[in-house]
Amino acid sequence: MIIVTGGAGFIGSNIVKALNDKGITDILVVDNLKDGTKFVNLVDLNIADYMDKEDFLIQIMSGEELGDIEAIFHEGACSSTTEWDGKYMMDNNYQYSKELLHYCLEREIPFLYASSAATYGGRTSDFIESREYEKPLNVYGYSKFLFDEYVRQILPEANSQIVGFRYFNVYGPREGHKGSMASVAFHLNTQLNNGESPKLFEGSENFKRDFVYVGDVAAVNLWFLESGKSGIFNLGTGRAESFQAVADATLAYHKKGSIEYIPFPDKLKGRYQAFTQADLTNLRNAGYDKPFKTVAEGVTEYMAWLNRDA
C-alpha cells in the first residue's frame, strides 16, 4: 500500500493520478475534507481507502500498524503563504511531519515529502539547497525550512529513504479548490470564461517565477521512489518565466481577451517573491534527466484540461 497525505489536494491528487497511470491503485488517501469541494480531485481516480487526517495522526502517534506500507508521499500541509497563525502552521506543517517521519524511520518506509521554495525567502539568485541561501519571509516558509533542517540532521544516520522536494510555482489540474492560492493561469482562465478582462499586477513582465507543471512534479516524485535516492531537492524547471508569459499562453489558447493591469497591492510589498528560479544541479546530479514543460507547453495543456467540458 502507498499512502498519500493531502491526497485530495492539488499535488497529492496528481501523485495519486500518476500512480494510477502506472496501474497502482492500492493507495490510502489521507486528507481533511472539511472543505468538501476537494472531493472532486478524487472522483476520477482509483484508491483503496480514505482516512481523515486527525484519525491518521492518532494512529501514527500511537504507533499503530497500518499494514504493509510501501511508501508515504507526504503532501498534506497548510500551503497558504498568507496564513499568519504560527501555532496552527507549526502544528500542521512541522509537528505532523516529524511524527510521520519517525514512524517511517522506525519501519524503514520511504518518506517523500513536500518542502517549498518559500524556504529561500526574498532572494533573487542562487536558489540552492544549502543553509546560507535560506531565509523565509513568512511563517509558512519557516515551517518548511525548519523541517528541512530537522531532516538534514537525520539524513546521515537514516536507514531508509527520505527525500524532500522544494516545489517552486506549481500549476495545473486539480487546484480549483485553492481559491486565492490557485495559480495565475487558473485565475486568468476563470476571468476569461466569466467574460471579464484577465488581470495582472502592473509590472508583471518583470515578475518572473519558476512555473512548473504539476504533471512534471508528480513524475519527479515517482522517479525518486523508484530510484531510492535521498536528499532535499529543488523541484522547478530551472527557467524563470514572467507572469506575462503565463497570460500570453492563456490568451493564445482562448484566442480572445486583453490584459487589464492593476496596481500592485501595498500589503504584498516586501513579502512578494519577484523572482524565483530553481537551481537544478542537485536534481540532475541525482540522475533525473527528463525535460520540464515550458510555460507555453504547460499552460496550453492546462487550458485544454480546464476547458475540456466547454
From Swiss-Prot:
Record bears the keyword Cytoplasm? no
Q: Which cofactor does it need?
A: NADP(+)
Q: Which reaction does it catalyse?
A: ADP-D-glycero-beta-D-manno-heptose = ADP-L-glycero-beta-D-manno-heptose
Name the domain of life this protein comes from. Bacteria
List the pathway annotation.
Nucleotide-sugar biosynthesis; ADP-L-glycero-beta-D-manno-heptose biosynthesis; ADP-L-glycero-beta-D-manno-heptose from D-glycero-beta-D-manno-heptose 7-phosphate: step 4/4; Bacterial outer membrane biogenesis; LPS core biosynthesis
Query: Cofactor stoichiometry and binding?
Result: Binds 1 NADP(+) per subunit.
Q: Which residues form the active site?
A: Y140 (proton acceptor), K178 (proton acceptor)
For biological process, the GO terms are: ADP-L-glycero-beta-D-manno-heptose biosynthetic process; lipopolysaccharide core region biosynthetic process
Q: Which UniProt keywords apply?
A: Carbohydrate metabolism, Isomerase, NADP
Q: Which PANTHER family match?
A: ADP-L-GLYCERO-D-MANNO-HEPTOSE-6-EPIMERASE (PTHR43103:SF3), NUCLEOSIDE-DIPHOSPHATE-SUGAR EPIMERASE (PTHR43103)
Tell me which family the UniProt entry assigns to this protein: Belongs to the NAD(P)-dependent epimerase/dehydratase family. HldD subfamily.
- Read off the domain note: Contains a large N-terminal NADP-binding domain, and a smaller C-terminal substrate-binding domain.
> What does it do?
Catalyzes the interconversion between ADP-D-glycero-beta-D-manno-heptose and ADP-L-glycero-beta-D-manno-heptose via an epimerization at carbon 6 of the heptose.
Cited HAMAP family: Heptose_epimerase
Q: Could you tell me which NCBIfam families the record lists for this protein?
A: heptose_epim (TIGR02197), PRK11150.1 (NF008360)
Q: What is the name of the protein in this document?
A: ADP-L-glycero-D-manno-heptose-6-epimerase
